[in-house]
Amino acid sequence: MAIRNFRPYTPGTRTRVVTDFSEITSRKPERTLVVAKHRRKGRNNRGVITCRHRGGGHKRLYRVVDFRRNKHGVPAKVAAIHYDPHRNARLALLFYADGEKRYILAPAGVQVGQTVVSGPDAPIENGNAMPLSSVPLGSAVHCVELYAGRGGQMVRTAGASAQVMAKEGDYVALKLPSTEVRLVRRECYATLGEVGNSEMRNTSLGKAGRRRWLGRRPQVRGSVMNPCDHPHGGGEGRAPIGRSGPVTPWGKPALGLKTRKRNKPSNQYVLRKRRKTSKRSRGGRDS
């Protein structure tokens, strides 16, 4: 897998950088694993906007992904690597020995024809799923469960992986991609290796239209709005926001304020907090 750069034939291709899709082996998805999904466009059940700047975009069909890997001891053959419009990672189509077909997140390095298996006695190979108690120290894992049997909830984006740091008692210490070190129950399942398509972080959309194709609408800065639309709005010309710090459209502190509760019960499982990120690195902008 590699990335593809374009010559400046048009303004949209001047800065466009995409993955070359060379790892995709089949264009059509498995029909038995595809369902229609209503797009919420950032609205809740009452039609109220709960997530701004969402809407439009290309039509999609949802691929049903197996995050549980609960067919223990049944070997599966990787039949194809598919594209998924709902995520940055690729999907691996598995044909199990009993005839069942399932999608999983395609781990890095997994090839068509390779055999993967899940279970406590699975071999230590890339793509196999097993309890964290069976994973060797220092190994990279992804699609990690927070609660046993609920399915992988952490470390699922393209190129992501967590590292097994230590084992003590009923818990395993994991170093997450955010550098946070967290305790997870040893019976929780995880998949060996990192998620594929790691070059996704080096891509660039190149133009605003490609962002619209993904269902992302334009973001307007609060400082150019009217005061009735945003606390930063109003004034003559490029006026300052007139506050001690930036706020959201609803007047809540923004850009740097910690929103995690101090007495959150799961704080006892966080051994080391994630590193502090600067405004530039996290892509902060005027709300």
Swiss-Prot record:
Region named Disordered: 221-287
A Pfam family hit: Ribosomal_L2
Lineage: superkingdom: Bacteria
A Gene Ontology term for the protein's cellular component: large ribosomal subunit
Gene3D superfamilies for this protein: 2.30.30.30, Nucleic acid-binding proteins, Ribosomal protein L2, domain 3
Keyword tags: Ribonucleoprotein, Ribosomal protein, RNA-binding, rRNA-binding
PROSITE patterns, alphabetized: RIBOSOMAL_L2 (PS00467)
Biased composition range(s): Basic residues: 271-287
Swiss-Prot/TrEMBL GO biological process terms: translation
Keyword Ribonucleoprotein: yes
GO molecular function terms noted in the UniProt entry: rRNA binding; structural constituent of ribosome; transferase activity
HAMAP family: Ribosomal_uL2_B (MF_01320_B)
Subunit note: Part of the 50S ribosomal subunit. Forms a bridge to the 30S subunit in the 70S ribosome.
Function: One of the primary rRNA binding proteins. Required for association of the 30S and 50S subunits to form the 70S ribosome, for tRNA binding and peptide bond formation. It has been suggested to have peptidyltransferase activity; this is somewhat controversial. Makes several contacts with the 16S rRNA in the 70S ribosome.
Family: Belongs to the universal ribosomal protein uL2 family.
Protein name as annotated: Large ribosomal subunit protein uL2
